[in-house]
Amino acid sequence: MKTIIINGVQFNTDEDTTILKFARDNNIDISALCFLNNCNNDINKCEICTVEVEGTGLVTACDTLIEDGMIINTNSDAVNEKIKSRISQLLDIHEFKCGPCNRRENCEFLKLVIKYKARASKPFLPKDKTEYVDERSKSLTVDRTKCLLCGRCVNACGKNTETYAMKFLNKNGKTIIGAEDEKCFDDTNCLLCGQCIIACPVAALSEKSHMDRVKNALNAPEKHVIVAMAPSVRASIGELFNMGFGVDVTGKIYTALRQLGFDKIFDINFGADMTIMEEATELVQRIENNGPFPMFTSCCPGWVRQAENYYPELLNNLSSAKSPQQIFGTASKTYYPSISGLDPKNVFTVTVMPCTSKKFEADRPQMEKDGLRDIDAVITTRELAKMIKDAKIPFAKLEDSEADPAMGEYSGAGAIFGATGGVMEAALRSAKDFAENAELEDIEYKQVRGLNGIKEAEVEINNNKYNVAVINGASNLFKFMKSGMINEKQYHFIEVMACHGGCVNGGGQPHVNPKDLEKVDIKKVRASVLYNQDEHLSKRKSHENTALVKMYQNYFGKPGEGRAHEILHFKYKK
């Protein structure tokens, strides 16, 4: 048993933990910047978490273990002076222009500057930002005038993806962050997943914005602008309007999109149901033809880049069904014009995504037909929130409305795509019905749900048993492959999501304060919104979506055949 005193209060504990964690667990506030829970920074130390230990002096709380007899002061004059001095030093390398900054509402550094009344000794105000800003990537933007060199992006990349694509670099004697040899991230092993952006406490890292594309289209009279949001957006955007975590705001988003001026409001959940129609059909065909196995999902562009960069031998095993975003985009330029009488050239398709890698996917050269892009612009959850705020739309007070029916209806299977295991479960619901030519009532595959890194299950289809696996996060895919598990048994179907927790934890989602992350399992809470929708929808299988059935009957024909196979599939190659 250890006895310690913090700010005059005695605690008894058996824990072996750091001063920072123990203090926060006991509601004692200690400021921090470089520290992220479960992602400790062993590269750069910001020293913002400095505390004073009697007999020892000033120490950093994030990496100093508590010891019996410690007397700790978190708010002494020496502590406050040290922290203020460090913040002032950081201000000397940080462009302190908060007005136009996209992080001004949730900038962790700004809060520290205000709290400690810090000032720069020599303000950093570059006249020409060209050498500091890297916008070459289709997904990510780096603004080094904002970078504090805290190392959170480097550590988050290493822990969450194990690609170590984000690095500290030496440029003319100065330390910067970037890709190896200052290459464009797209030309490296980077997954473009955006976990580095989520980790960044300031605006040094952000998504490549498509907002100007969208605004220009909305202001072009000849353009018919349609929009569709991904499943996870409805589970998170409320956080950016002070509505708390885990609030379903589907109807409010539809209303806000109409007020922004979009001509038609559809839903990517419809695209998810389309993907399942094709993917489940493909799985059944492989079962009937005895392979090739395993079939991997292909709807996560971060995972696709991981396969391309590290395991190109697996590309032939990826499902050829387009992702919900791309398959929706294809339908928006073919089926939708056929029922609306519009010229496909005038249809401008926008998606709202929780993912930065979706921007890269949408801009792949092959993702077009007859010169028309499947998707014209991709905005993240954060970008949509900014558009709503810029338009002064009172989001939290909006009445709910519905999506437009032609491509806005969706099933519970489409809704759960945003959670790890959701694609697997949705596909199995339809594949089992297709293979057994029945409408089965037992539709929940809870063994593939949850946040474990590698989940396995055995499913029965037509009295035969099939092995499936769900890989939760890019780092766990590396573990799965390096362990040899893929060769230990015959897997038939494997889902992979690059981001831990799935799309609900994507790189385009709202920033969450690290202190909140220590208290709230954000992945679980956001996913609960999707599972709740699934549970309460009358149609819980993709092939029960009446608007989808109508589309196949009147335009695409049978899933996996003819026109459907020709334009709703894309084969990734080495």
Curated annotation (Swiss-Prot):
CDD domains linked: fer2
E.C. code: 1.12.7.2
MF terms (GO), sorted A to Z: 4 iron, 4 sulfur cluster binding; ferredoxin hydrogenase activity; iron ion binding
Cofactor note: Binds 1 [2Fe-2S] cluster per subunit.
Residues binding [4Fe-4S] cluster 3, per UniProt: C157, C190, C193, C196
Positions of the 4Fe-4S ferredoxin-type domain: 138-167, 181-210
Recorded catalytic activity of this chain's protein: H2 + 2 oxidized [2Fe-2S]-[ferredoxin] = 2 reduced [2Fe-2S]-[ferredoxin] + 2 H(+)
Domain 4Fe-4S His(Cys)3-ligated-type per the UniProt entry, residue ranges: 78-117
Residue positions binding [4Fe-4S] cluster 4: C300, C355, C499, C503
Keyword Repeat: yes
Domain 2Fe-2S ferredoxin-type: 1-78
A Pfam family per the record: Fer2_4
Positions bound to [4Fe-4S] cluster 1: H94, C98, C101, C107
Keywords, ordered alphabetically: 4Fe-4S, Iron, Iron-sulfur, Metal-binding, Oxidoreductase, Repeat
InterPro entries (alphabetical): 2Fe-2S_ferredoxin-like_sf (IPR036010), 2Fe-2S_ferredoxin-type (IPR001041), 4Fe4S_Fe-S-bd (IPR017896), 4Fe4S_Fe_S_CS (IPR017900), Cytosolic_Fe-S_CAF (IPR050340), Fe_hydrogenase (IPR009016), Fe_hydrogenase_lsu_C (IPR004108), Fe_hydrogenase_ssu (IPR003149)
SUPFAM superfamilies found in the cross-reference section: 2Fe-2S ferredoxin-like, 4Fe-4S ferredoxins, Fe-only hydrogenase
Binding site for Fe(2+): C503
Binding site for [2Fe-2S] cluster: C34, C46, C49, C62
Binding positions ([4Fe-4S] cluster 2): C147, C150, C153, C200
Cofactor requirements of the protein: [2Fe-2S] cluster; [4Fe-4S] cluster; Fe(2+)
Subunit structure: Monomer.
Family annotation (PANTHER family): NITRATE, FORMATE, IRON DEHYDROGENASE (PTHR11615)
Record-linked NCBIfam families: FeFe_hydrog_A, Hydr_FeFe_Clost
Protein name per the record: Iron hydrogenase 1
Species of the source: Clostridium pasteurianum
Source taxonomy: Bacteria, Bacillati, Bacillota, Clostridia, Eubacteriales
